[in-house]
């Protein structure tokens, strides 16, 4: 028996006299339940695998003494009493003496294990009491098993109020739950477990019946505090005052010091000397050209009737003028600048004639399959024709296009869609806007589709003079249909613009 005692002491088991008492054998069903409840992957090789294969002789009592006790019934099941399964009877040899009622175990006290609980992950670690609880009374393995199981301390209170039951996740050094369920005395429902939840260790197995802890506070989305409506608004810097600076004011006032009748007269004289020779001695070559009268400079006003040509004449002699523009780029650049200035100062009838001139020139080029060149003086000044017509017809077209259910003038010129063409007015502005856009973009050559002409087609839908005749017609028609007196006056003044009323005074303090 001395040998058995030494072996038990060396194993580090804290056994009392009650562990060696003779108890009835443990049922197999209770043992299986106990093994399932402790199946966390942690087992002690020092006490569960020491079965002696030689029968009843030898250290057989060590196996029975170290065998895990049966987990008691769960106290949370109502109506099921907490019973203890009797321990199996210790088997003894025929020559072994009976243990005394008061043996040496009751006087030795607790034996300090040879290794720390942290280093021992087996049954030694599981037998340690929770660090937050007081040391239980020495009552053998049954008392400690009762404290570890679900029927431990606090089970009676848990039966009285199951709603106040809260899981305890205090870990023992062996990474086992210290207690199954416990109650927080006086704590409200659900508050006991919220303050004691601990997450499972990284990489370790998740224990059944233990709730996961909520994520840390730093990972939660925290809304900013609401702004106090009574708090003063942040100060904003006042924008800089929009004024004329002092230097510019001095420059404006200094004009009076330089302005004089003599200087104004000298300015008119110098300008008149430049205009008779705009090409600077390098005009278009006009020898033996049918276009010689218009290629050279002219001192008098332009008379459209003296420059009238038929469509057949334009078709016959148009290519020679086209080649003149293409073969003299410097003269063509000068002619383009001069034409732009002239077109922006034309009256309404002259502006309509310029629109017809541009479209008829494009039709002639298409007729002879000539490229539409943006450097051409006629095609390159389309924007001037468009701007002048839009300025003169804008007051009238606001009423006319709205009455016809068409797009506004600005929208027609910005969209530049062939599908928006519904009459002669929309045709003129859309086609001129498309040509001006291509010239502004600086394309090398304008395709015929810009004017709505398909492949292999001619510009048969346009007849020279349609711009002037068509726009004068709609002015007269709408003036009779519209009941607005303002619209009638506007349309009449566009067609026949003699001065009747409008200017009130002329003020000049300088000369």
UniProtKB/Swiss-Prot annotation:
GO terms for cellular component: host cell cytoplasm; host cell nucleus. A zinc finger (CHC2-type) spans 399-487. Binds viral intronless RNAs through the RGG region. Residues 213-232 have a biased composition (Pro residues). It comes from Human herpesvirus 1 (strain HFEM) (HHV-1). Residues 1-15 have a biased composition (Low complexity). Keywords: Activation of host NF-kappa-B by virus, Activator, Early protein, Eukaryotic host gene expression shutoff by virus, G1/S host cell cycle checkpoint dysregulation by virus, Host cytoplasm, Host gene expression shutoff by virus, Host mRNA suppression by virus, Host nucleus, Host-virus interaction, Inhibition of host pre-mRNA processing by virus, Metal-binding, Methylation, Modulation of host cell cycle by virus, Phosphoprotein, RNA-binding, Transcription, Transcription regulation, Zinc, Zinc-finger. The modification Phosphoserine is found at residues 16, 18, 114. This is mRNA export factor. Zn(2+) binds at residues 399, 478, 482, 487. It holds the Pfam family HHV-1_VABD. The modification Dimethylated arginine is found at residues 138, 150. InterPro entries: HHV-1_REF-bd, ICP27-like. A motif (Nuclear export signal) lies at residues 5-17. One of its GO terms (molecular function) is RNA binding. One of its GO terms (biological process) is symbiont-mediated activation of host NF-kappaB cascade. Residues 138-152 are annotated as: RGG-box. Multifunctional regulator of the expression of viral genes that contributes to the shutoff of host protein synthesis and mediates nuclear export of viral intronless mRNAs. Early in infection, this immediate early (EI) protein mediates the inhibition of cellular splicing. This results in the accumulation of unprocessed 3'end pre-mRNAs which can't be exported from the nucleus. Cellular protein synthesis is thereby shut off early after virus infection. The keyword Kinase does not apply. Residues 1-244 are annotated as: Disordered. Residues 104-112 are annotated as: Interaction with host ALYREF. The modification Omega-N-methylarginine is found at residue 148. Coiled coil: none annotated. A motif (Nuclear localization signal) lies at residues 110-138.
